[in-house]
Swiss-Prot record:
One of its GO terms (molecular function) is ubiquinol-cytochrome-c reductase activity. It comes from Hylopetes nigripes (Palawan flying squirrel). The cytochrome bc1 complex contains 11 subunits: 3 respiratory subunits (MT-CYB, CYC1 and UQCRFS1), 2 core proteins (UQCRC1 and UQCRC2) and 6 low-molecular weight proteins (UQCRH/QCR6, UQCRB/QCR7, UQCRQ/QCR8, UQCR10/QCR9, UQCR11/QCR10 and a cleavage product of UQCRFS1). This cytochrome bc1 complex then forms a dimer. The lineage of its organism: Eukaryota, Metazoa, Chordata, Craniata, Vertebrata. InterPro entries: Cyt_b/b6_C, Cyt_b/b6_C_sf, Cyt_b/b6_N, Cytb/b6-like_sf, Cytochrome_b, Cytochrome_b_C_euk/bac, Cytochrome_b_N_euk/bac, Di-haem_cyt_TM. This is Cytochrome b. One of its GO terms (cellular component) is respiratory chain complex III.
Length: 379
């Protein structure tokens, strides 16, 4: 009798994706982040579902409903902090996952890569709308500032902003629709993640060397399922340490003050994972220019397959490219730091320099270095 695992229409799909999947034998721990992202998404959906049972999306009661969750609901404080810090863990895994893709040339599978960039946008949109829901000071003013950026779009901008707000300012209508979208988007993200995997399994995984690995593949289970499990345990250890010991480490104290449209916080800033893009936005004195730079700072990822001019796929054997890759990483850390600082000297000029460097490395330096390396290897 043939194995049900290989014949059953549903189990067969799971088998081809997670059990009998031929996997390159040399993939390192950098390949763990896909499964960790799936794990983060599951945590976010489960904790979010339980939070939605007690949350009310009304401007009058939203803040107090979050307080009620933390004080009166059984383990409500745990669910709330797991959800808030789960977003941070999600973005840490996302940035490492994208960084791995850039370093090892995974963007050559451009369907998988482009779906991944769309996923990144969807996760960023979800996180932004989720940040508005507790209806604290930073929630309200963050929503006001970020949605207002759309007014920079010529001709339709102002109408578009008022349409998104559902009125002439961020109010009850805005909060209700943000809650609705925040609830539905994670399920769309889950569907997109399945498409992401579908495209990946069409080509098979990349590996650190960037070479074709068809002659050296091993089954995903038990080798990489155990490896992924270890990754999940390490993530859980870091995550629960964060949740149980320093739950407010990555949050903003201003969000413990109820939203007040008459009182602007001294420094309006988004969550830490958006600070790099926020710094790029602020470094351009023109509103429309800033918005375009903000969008392009993420959209630029879609250009990587076109900008890849090296004869080698991975950066593993390209020390010059490696050097500039790590300068790019350092530049992103600098932008993240600048995004959290007030708009004053010397932070303005540092932010502008870091923003120029970010686009220059990606659009000019890395392609040029790739050609130089080809030349050095007489290719």
């Amino acid at each position: 009798m043939t194995n049900i695992r290989k014949t059953h229409p549903l189990i067969k799909i799971v088998n081809h994706s997670f059990i009998d999947l031929p996997t390159p034998s040399n993939i390192s721990a950098w390949w763990n982040f896909g499964s960790l992202l799936g794990f983060c998404l599951i945590i976010q959906i489960i904790t979010g579902l339980f939070l939605a049972m007690h949350y009310t999306s009304d401007t009058v009661t939203a803040f107090s409903s979050v307080t009620h969750i933390c004080r009166d609901v059984n383990y409500g404080w745990l669910i709330r902090y797991m959800h808030a810090n789960g977003a941070s863990m999600f973005f840490i895994c996302l940035f490492l996952h994208v960084g791995r893709g850039l370093y090892y040339g995974s963007y050559i599978y451009f369907e998988t890569w482009n779906i991944g960039v769309i996923l990144l946008f969807a996760v960023m949109a979800t996180a932004f709308m989720g940040y508005v829901l507790p209806w604290g000071q930073m929630s309200f003013w963050g929503a006001t500032v970020i949605t207002n950026l759309l007014s920079a779009i010529p001709y339709i901008g102002t109408t578009l902003v008022e349409w998104i707000w559902g009125g002439f300012s961020v109010d009850k209508a805005t909060l209700t629709r943000f809650f609705a979208f925040h609830f539905v988007l994670p399920f769309i993200i889950a569907a997109l993640a399945m498409i992401h995997l579908l495209f990946l399994h069409e080509t098979g995984s990349n590996n650190p060397s960037g070479l074709i690995s068809d002659s050296d593949k091993i089954p995903f289970h038990p080798y990489f399922s155990i490896k992924d499990l270890l990754g999940v345990l390490i993530l859980l250890l870091i995550f629960m340490n964060l949740v149980l010991f320093t739950p407010d480490l990555l949050g903003d104290p201003d969000n413990y003050t109820p939203a007040n449209p008459l009182n602007t916080p001294p420094h309006i800033k988004p969550e830490w994972y958006f600070l790099f893009a926020y710094a790029i936005l602020r470094s351009i004195p023109n509103k429309l220019g800033g918005v375009l730079a903000l969008v392009f700072s993420i959209l630029i990822l879609m250009l990587f397959p076109i900008l890849h001019l090296s004869k080698q796929r991975s950066m593993m054997f390209r020390p010059l490219s490696q050097c500039f890759f790590w300068i790019l990483v350092a530049d992103l850390f600098t932008l993240t730091w600048i995004g959290g600082q007030p708009v004053e000297h010397p932070f303005i000029i540092i932010g502008q320099t870091a923003s120029i460097l970010y686009f220059t490395i990606i659009l000019v330096i890395l392609p040029f270095i790739s050609l130089l390396e080809n030349k050095l290897l007489k290719w």
